[in-house]
Design a protein with these regions (language model features):
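Interfacial aromatic-anchored transmembrane helix boundaries in multi-pass membrane proteins
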Residues: 43-54, 82-116
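Structural signal for the C-terminal ends of transmembrane alpha-helices
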Residues: 68-72, 119-127
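Residues that define the loop-to-transmembrane-helix transition and helix capping
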Residues: 72, 106, 134-135
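Alpha-helical transmembrane segments in multi-pass membrane proteins
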Residues: 33-41, 62, 66, 77-85, ...
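Hydrophobic transmembrane alpha-helices
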Residues: 2-77, 87
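Membrane-embedded alpha-helical hairpins and interfacial helices in multi-pass inner-membrane proteins
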Residues: 127-166
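Juxtamembrane/transmembrane-helix boundary motifs in multi-pass membrane proteins
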Residues: 18, 22, 26, 50, ...
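Alpha-helical transmembrane segments and their helix-entry boundary regions
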Residues: 74-78, 101, 137
């Protein structure tokens, strides 16, 4: 298939519809693969000296999960990422895992991943005209800052209060 400017929009629509029309088993498998991609991207870390929470590339995978898989399966991919990370796969940032990560300084960000993935999937599914680059970049920006950063800061503030009394 040769993609050029003339057939770009029809190709974009075709790919999106193909994912949405896939079988349930295929969508669950894609959710698991997106959870794995999130775990891999979590290993790209930029530590910040003023906070215990580093910047990671996993946010990109989180936002793409809602974009590619839609609200239900994008959200499922992030729930799988969290559940498997808490249960036995050390794939959170810095190859960490376990319940202490979810209940620690990064727990609010992990909860925000589920919310952001659902929101982006909802917008992508509900508003077909939002599937262009400029509109989706705005939606992703809102989801990144409002739906990941705000719950993350709330979780970090709670963690500081409970551990340091600040």
């Amino acid at each position: 298939m040769n993609i050029n400017l003339e057939n770009y929009y029809s190709t974009r629509k075709s790919v999106f519809e193909r994912i949405q029309d896939a079988s349930t088993a295929t969508k669950v498998l894609m959710s698991l693969l997106m959870a794995c991609l999130t775990g891999i991207m979590a290993q790209i870390i930029i530590p910040l000296p003023w906070t215990p929470v580093p910047v990671t590339a996993q946010t990109f995978a989180v936002l793409c999960s809602g974009l590619f898989l839609g609200k239900k399966y994008g959200c499922l991919s992030q729930i799988l990422y969290i559940v498997l990370g808490v249960a036995f796969i050390p794939w959170f940032g810095g190859m960490t895992g376990g319940l202490d990560v979810l209940l620690g300084s990064t727990g609010g960000f992990l909860i925000g991943f589920v919310i952001a993935s659902y929101f982006i999937g909802l917008i992508t599914e509900k508003y077909a005209d939002a599937r262009n680059f400029k509109k989706m970049a705005a939606v992703i920006g809102i989801a990144n800052f409002a739906l990941i950063y705000i719950p993350g800061l709330a979780g970090l503030a709670l963690w500081f209060y409970l551990t340091q009394g600040i």
